[in-house]
């Protein structure tokens, strides 16, 4: 599903590689935590999967896509199979909950009848059926993140990338969001989540991939946040 094969990413502005000879394989349907301190390479790792960056050397593959060889019109095709959730929600403030989710399908050319069928289904999945006509500023932070997750999941992506999705949320709301991501994962979607939240990582005991200074320092099944925890 996801393979990084001897991947190095060197930025001209830095003496140290952002990623240094990374070898990782993530299978279909896995739930993986990507951890490490700020500057460890987590964001670069995710940007490579989206073809937002190209590796200096090595190969990046997502499903059938040889990511670092994609050009032009093929990049949007890759991004149709990857959903993204961010810490800051990134909702369209002038659009309703329904329209925020529908927009993700409109931009890839889905027919109106398909949109009208699928959007209510995904709003039901994330527990927002009763708030389809609300604007983002009428929602709590947890509800806004549910909209962001619905938007990322509405096209039934093969992979869901979640970059600190609970970073702005209180512990109880964070747990609700993690329950939702687990439910999505059980549908067969591969979930890769970058986080600094050791409580979430320690409680869920999923696979943990840890980066430090651009190097892969740990890849552990049923891992916890720290080696000594």
Swiss-Prot record:
pH note: Optimum pH is 7.4-7.8 for ATPase activity.
Reported impact of residue 42 to R: Does not bind ATP. Does not affect dimerization
GO molecular function terms attached to this record: ATP binding; ATP hydrolysis activity; transmembrane transporter activity
Subcellular location: Cell membrane
Keyword Hydrolase: yes
Membrane topology term: Peripheral membrane protein
Example GO BP: cell division
Gene3D superfamilies given in the database record: P-loop containing nucleotide triphosphate hydrolases (3.40.50.300)
Keywords noted in UniProt: ATP-binding, Cell cycle, Cell division, Cell membrane, Hydrolase, Membrane, Nucleotide-binding
Regulation (activators, inhibitors): Requires magnesium or manganese for optimal activity. Inhibited by high concentrations of cobalt and by cupric phenanthroline.
A cellular-component GO term for this protein: plasma membrane
Residues noted as binding ATP in the record, renumbered to the chain: 36-43
Note: The active form is a dimer, wherein the participating monomers are held together by non-covalent interactions, with the Cys-84 of each monomer present at the dimer interface. In vitro, under oxidizing environment, the dimer gets stabilized by the formation of Cys-84-Cys-84 disulfide bond.
Function of the molecule: Part of the ABC transporter FtsEX involved in cellular division. Has ATPase activity.
NCBIfam families: FtsE
Protein name (record): Cell division ATP-binding protein FtsE
Provenance organism: Mycobacterium tuberculosis (strain ATCC 25177 / H37Ra)
Lineage: Bacteria, Bacillati, Actinomycetota, Actinomycetes, Mycobacteriales
